[in-house]
Structures are given as structure tokens and as C-alpha cells.
Amino acid sequence: MSGMEWFPLLGLANRARKVVSGEDLVIKEIRNARAKLVLLTEDASSNTAKKVTDKCNYYKVPYKKVESRAVLGRSIGKEARVVVAVTDQGFANKLISLLD
């Protein structure tokens, strides 16, 4: 489980209702300046990846890539997810430090 220190923290953020999942909802959070960090899977489609990363770059929201959609979904207790946004600055800062 090396390199997966972020896994339980994202689950905790989800239980605290500080995580939004799904492409449309994440883009809405980015536009409304509520997203503090976006997690995107490496197996996301090129169209989805471009759309999300372009929004993050334009609105200056940091984003990180994680292994797969199954891992990301499992970390928040749901089915496979391609993109999630963290809406709390404290959780976002800790996740950034763990993912670097």
C-alpha cells in the first residue's frame, strides 16, 4: 500500500461532506471557486482530462493525478470515479503534501 497515504484522508473528507464527484459537479465547483483541489485519474478520457485541467488552470485550482478510477472511487466508498474535487482548504493542503 506504499504511496496510498492519501487514500484514508480522502475518505475522511468525503464523510465530512467536503468532496464532490462527477465531471459536471466538479466543473461547477471550480467555476464557483469552491474547489480547493481536484483529483483526476490517469485513465480518464483525453476529452475529460483536457476539460478539467483547462478549467483548473484558468481558475488557478491545483490538480493532482491518481492511479485509476477504481482506486479513486473506492477511496470515497463509491463506484469508479474519474474526477473529484475537495472543497476544504485543510484537507486539500494535506492531500497535496501526501500526493507530492
Swiss-Prot record:
One of its GO terms (biological process) is ribosome biogenesis. InterPro entries: Ribosomal_eL30-like_sf, Ribosomal_eL8-like_CS, Ribosomal_eL8/eL30/eS12/Gad45. Pfam families: Ribosomal_L7Ae (PF01248). This is RNA-binding protein YlxQ. Keywords: RNA-binding. It comes from Bacillus subtilis (strain 168). Disruption phenotype: None; has no effect on viability, growth or sporulation at low, normal or elevated temperatures. RNA-binding protein that recognizes the K-turn motif present in ribosomal RNA, but also in box C/D and box C'/D' sRNAs. Belongs to the eukaryotic ribosomal protein eL8 family. GO terms for cellular component: ribonucleoprotein complex. GO terms for molecular function: RNA binding. The lineage of its organism: Bacteria, Bacillati, Bacillota, Bacilli, Bacillales.
